[in-house]
């Protein structure tokens, strides 16, 4: 089993990321999260580089107050660097699973390190990892 787990990489199981610009409103982010049916969105700057993560909890917290959600940009409420846990496509799935458990989060951005910052190239979720482990079990590892 250990040998099999050491051959499961993020690149083979990652899914398409849902990214939003740091200037969009909280209201628009709520609509987008609902339409895309995701629990986390990755926030990028004008250079398409990762600057934050936006969770359901962030959006819910913002909507509880009396603020006008159309006038608040998501960069006010998002989790910012360096408090973002991320992974690369070359990481082992088992290591990413451990990060998700340790941080008690549902997904991670898959990033490519560039000279200017981190480019979001995918996402890995608890569901992606569960599918991989179920497939491994079905193969009889």
Model regions: which residues?
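Short, acidic/hydrophobic/Gly-rich beta-strand patch recurrent on exposed beta strands
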Residues: 76-78, 111, 123
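The conserved cystathionine-beta-synthase
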Residues: 19-37, 44-45, 85-106, 110-113, ...
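A contiguous binding-surface segment within folded domains or other stable secondary-structure elements
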Residues: 69
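Bateman (tandem CBS) regulatory domains
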Residues: 4-17, 72-84
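Short beta-to-alpha loop/turn elements within the nucleotide-binding domains of ABC transporters
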Residues: 8, 24, 54, 72, ...
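Terminal peptide-recognition signature
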Residues: 33, 48, 77, 100, ...
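Short, solvent-exposed loop/turn segments that connect beta-strands within catalytic domains
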Residues: 113-119
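Short beta->alpha transition motifs characteristic of CBS
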Residues: 38, 42, 50-65, 105-106, ...
């Amino acid at each position: 089993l250990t040998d099999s787990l050491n051959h499961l990489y993020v690149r083979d199981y990652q899914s398409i990321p849902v990214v939003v610009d740091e200037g969009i409103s909280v209201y628009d982010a709520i609509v987008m999260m609902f339409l895309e049916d995701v629990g986390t969105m990755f926030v990028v700057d004008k250079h398409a580089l990762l600057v934050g993560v936006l969770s359901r909890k962030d959006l819910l917290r913002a909507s509880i107050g009396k603020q006008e959600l159309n006038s608040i940009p998501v960069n006010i409420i998002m989790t910012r660097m360096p408090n973002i846990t991320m992974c690369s496509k070359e990481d082992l799935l088992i290591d990413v699973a451990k990060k998700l458990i340790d941080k008690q989060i549902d997904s991670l951005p898959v990033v490519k390190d560039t000279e200017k910052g981190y480019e979001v190239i995918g996402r890995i979720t608890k569901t992606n990892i569960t599918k991989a482990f179920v497939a491994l079990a079905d193969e009889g590892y």
